Swiss-Prot record:
Top-level taxonomy: Bacteria, Bacillati, Cyanobacteriota, Cyanophyceae, Oscillatoriophycideae
Cellular localisation: Cellular thylakoid membrane
Protein name (Swiss-Prot/TrEMBL): ATP synthase subunit delta
Pfam families, A to Z: OSCP
Entry-linked PANTHER family: ATP SYNTHASE DELTA CHAIN (PTHR11910)
Main location: membrane
InterPro entries associated with the record: ATP_synth_OSCP/delta_N_sf, ATPase_OSCP/d_CS, ATPase_OSCP/dsu
Species in which this protein is naturally found: Gloeothece citriformis (strain PCC 7424)
Similarity-based family: Belongs to the ATPase delta chain family.
Function: F(1)F(0) ATP synthase produces ATP from ADP in the presence of a proton or sodium gradient. F-type ATPases consist of two structural domains, F(1) containing the extramembraneous catalytic core and F(0) containing the membrane proton channel, linked together by a central stalk and a peripheral stalk. During catalysis, ATP synthesis in the catalytic domain of F(1) is coupled via a rotary mechanism of the central stalk subunits to proton translocation.
PROSITE patterns: ATPASE_DELTA
Cellular component per GO, a single term: plasma membrane-derived thylakoid membrane
Quaternary structure, from the entry: F-type ATPases have 2 components, F(1) - the catalytic core - and F(0) - the membrane proton channel. F(1) has five subunits: alpha(3), beta(3), gamma(1), delta(1), epsilon(1). CF(0) has four main subunits: a(1), b(1), b'(1) and c(10-14). The alpha and beta chains form an alternating ring which encloses part of the gamma chain. F(1) is attached to F(0) by a central stalk formed by the gamma and epsilon chains, while a peripheral stalk is formed by the delta, b and b' chains.
Alphabetical UniProt keywords: ATP synthesis, CF(1), Hydrogen ion transport, Ion transport, Membrane, Thylakoid, Transport
Length: 184
């Protein structure tokens, strides 16, 4: 259900409502930080994701867990929004709502999301180099990097910006050489 159009159709109005609340209270960046933390938690804890999306578990239990997870440092508006998702039985779409909110935030701040796959973890200098390259390619004011590691690349990086892919990996270069030699 993660990428289905139905889940997007359900998540989008909630994300827009949250964006509207955050804009009217000048909390867009703060909500963005809290939502990124929540997404990290959901991505690193399949148990939590399953717990929240399980229709058999009572709403009170889900609310209690969310209250504990979010703590007092989370803005009350965002906590109340999460409780609303539980009440409306839409908490199973939390991940999609969060992703959609971040997409709206990037659009608002002229920020582009760049998914970077590298053979090893990028150091600060390499990250900055990738950010500069993405800014040049996209014309965006800011870049949000989503980095992952794939040792099969051997070296280099693959950068995905929207539907555009820049393959600067050794594996990609070897594949292109293989294709050109195969055509001879």
């Amino acid at each position: 259900m993660k990428g289905s159009s139905l889940s997007l159709e359900i998540a989008e109005p909630y994300a827009q409502a949250l964006m509207s609340v955050s804009q009217s209270n000048n909390l867009t960046e703060r909500f963005g930080e809290d939502i990124r933390s929540l997404l990290d938690l959901l991505n690193n804890s399949p148990e939590l994701r399953e717990f929240l999306s399980n229709p058999v578990i009572r709403e009170e239990n889900k609310k209690e867990i969310l209250q504990r997870i979010m703590g007092d440092q989370t803005h009350p508006y965002l906590r109340n929004f999460l409780m609303l998702l539980v009440d409306k039985r839409r908490i199973a779409f939390l991940e999609q709502v969060c992703e959609q909110y971040l997409a709206l935030l990037r659009q608002l701040t002229n920020t582009v999301l760049a998914e970077v796959v590298s053979a090893t973890e990028l150091n600060d200098e390499q990250r900055q180099s990738v950010i500069d390259k993405v800014k040049t390619i996209s014309g965006a004011q800011a870049v949000e990097l989503k980095a992952s590691i794939n040792p099969d690349l051997i070296g280099g990086v693959i950068i995905k910006i929207g539907s555009q892919i820049l393959d600067a990996s050794i594996r990609g270069q070897l594949r292109r050489i293989s294709l050109s030699l195969g055509g001879v």
